[in-house]
Amino acid sequence: MFGKGGMGNLMKQAQQMQEKMQRMQEEIAQLEVTGESGAGLVKVTINGAHNCRRVEVDPSLLEDDKDMLEDLIAAAFNDAARRIAETQKEKMAAVSSGMQLPPGFKMPF
């Protein structure tokens, strides 16, 4: 079923992948990305754990409509969350490349 040494190799690959994923998750947690809205007038920086690290608002917006500013902050946060999710997906895909996984096997990320 697994061929010569197949089961042992499969277990070794699984352990290596688990170690790589652990390192990658630690690396991702340290990443910071910045999302923007309003053509860069509002910027939100989050880390890989989706914790907000910084919010920057252009002073010209402080005189405008409060509701609009709130919407821009939310949009900037959502942009940052999307960017970190894309980065996580790319980095985790790199971990699984080269693995001899069965066809149709879905990784948990």
Curated annotation (Swiss-Prot):
<protein>
    <recommendedName>
        <fullName>Nucleoid-associated protein SG0690</fullName>
    </recommendedName>
</protein>
<feature type="region of interest" description="Disordered">
    <location>
        <begin position="1"/>
        <end position="23"/>
    </location>
</feature>
<dbReference type="GO" id="GO:0043590">
    <property type="term" value="C:bacterial nucleoid"/>
</dbReference>
<dbReference type="Pfam" id="PF02575">
    <property type="entry name" value="YbaB_DNA_bd"/>
</dbReference>
<comment type="subunit">
    <text>Homodimer.</text>
</comment>
<dbReference type="GO" id="GO:0005829">
    <property type="term" value="C:cytosol"/>
</dbReference>
<comment type="function">
    <text>Binds to DNA and alters its conformation. May be involved in regulation of gene expression, nucleoid organization and DNA protection.</text>
</comment>
<dbReference type="InterPro" id="IPR036894">
    <property type="entry name" value="YbaB-like_sf"/>
</dbReference>
<keyword id="KW-0238">DNA-binding</keyword>
<keyword id="KW-0963">Cytoplasm</keyword>
<comment type="similarity">
    <text>Belongs to the YbaB/EbfC family.</text>
</comment>
<dbReference type="InterPro" id="IPR004401">
    <property type="entry name" value="YbaB/EbfC"/>
</dbReference>
<dbReference type="GO" id="GO:0003677">
    <property type="term" value="F:DNA binding"/>
</dbReference>
